[in-house]
Amino acid sequence: MAVKIRLKRMGSKKAPFYRVVVADSRSPRDGRFIEEIGTYNPLTQPAKVELKEDRALDWMLKGAKPSDTVRNLFSKAGLMEKLHNAKNEK
């Protein structure tokens, strides 16, 4: 099973709010997911991102691939650097 970390769209029309979820790559964008690991609100200034960093790092170490947008969010939060350091420690 290929697992992705991606955004699930919530909110109303023209007022998007996203949840960062771990999901099977074959499931629909807003469909079934395995675990919710954070939120992203692009409408606030600056955009508000809340992440469960330990869970996100755990899933990526297990092989989950983040989408491009989620990868950018993780980079800004410093999570990709932590992943790189964790992989090099082994």
From Swiss-Prot:
Pfam families the UniProt entry points to: Ribosomal_S16
Any one GO BP annotation for this protein: translation
Keywords annotated in UniProt: Ribonucleoprotein, Ribosomal protein
Q: Which InterPro entries match?
A: Ribosomal_bS16, Ribosomal_bS16_dom_sf
Gene3D superfamilies membership: 3.30.1320.10
The molecular function GO annotations come to: structural constituent of ribosome
Q: Which domain of life is it from?
A: Bacteria
- The family this protein is said to belong to: Belongs to the bacterial ribosomal protein bS16 family.
The UniProt entry, under PANTHER family, shows:
30S RIBOSOMAL PROTEIN S16 (PTHR12919), SMALL RIBOSOMAL SUBUNIT PROTEIN BS16M (PTHR12919:SF20)
What is the recorded name of this protein? Small ribosomal subunit protein bS16
Name the gene behind this protein.
Answer: rpsP
